[in-house]
A protein has these predicted regions:
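Structural motif
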Residues: 1, 25, 73-75
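Catalytic core and acceptor-binding pocket of nucleotide-sugar-dependent glycosyltransferases
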Residues: 52-168
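Short beta-strand-to-loop acidic/aromatic patch adjacent to the donor-nucleotide binding site
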Residues: 1-10
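Phosphate-binding glycine-rich loops and adjacent basic patches that engage nucleotide phosphates
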Residues: 6, 43-48, 63-70
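Conserved donor-nucleotide/metal-binding helix-loop-beta segment in metal-dependent transferases, i.e.
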Residues: 9-51
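A generic structural signal for short, solvent-exposed coil/turn residues
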Residues: 2, 20-22, 137
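A structural signal for short, well-ordered beta-strand segments and their strand-loop junctions
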Residues: 2-3, 27-29, 117-119
């Protein structure tokens, strides 16, 4: 499944998209500007206590920080079967997840028993960019860009216009 939010721009074509599907990764997304420190929770068996007594929720959390580099979901490609399998395996974590879904997949996609695979940093850059777009566009054109207006420099906008991705 291809996710394209309104602040994303697709630069590639169907053949490129098919190439990413065939590489065997279950989640493609842009590299984050800085590594994202993500905390998950270790959930006890008595999950009902979290909904019944939310004020003591934090007393039962054991945080496990992990730095994630890849996974921005604004322009992302997801294997539906593997995504569902991961959600089923991690359903107790998904029930209490308090952050964006892309961070869930980045975090739990690195350690699971359903063989869910997140594309590595160097390969993720070939799929989608979110920052340092001007420098990376000069190296190789990705399939698309996400949140490009947030980080766009004048040269990036000029490049996108010259190549027909933006109207002049």
């Amino acid at each position: 499944m291809l996710i394209v939010q309104t602040d994303a721009l697709v630069l590639g074509n169907a053949q490129q998209l098919d190439m990413f599907f065939r590489q065997g990764y279950d989640y493609w997304g842009a590299r984050w500007r800085r590594p994202v420190k993500i905390h998950s929770v270790e959930v006890r068996r008595d999950l009902w206590i979290f909904s019944a007594f939310p004020d003591i929720f934090w007393k039962y959390i054991c945080r496990h920080p992990r730095y994630c580099f890849v996974g921005n979901g604004g322009l992302s490609l997801r294997n539906i079967k593997k995504t569902i399998a991961l959600l089923r395996e991690k359903k107790i974590y998904a029930a209490v997840w308090f952050d964006n879904e892309d961070k869930f997949f980045a975090y739990h996609g690195l350690k699971n028993h359903v063989n869910f695979r997140v594309a590595p940093e160097d390969m993720a850059d070939s799929f989608s960019l979110e920052d340092f777009i001007k420098q990376r566009l000069n190296e190789a054109q990705p399939f698309g860009v996400h949140a490009w207006r947030r980080w766009a420099e004048l040269q990036t906008i000029r490049y996108l216009k010259e190549h027909g991705y933006l109207s002049r």
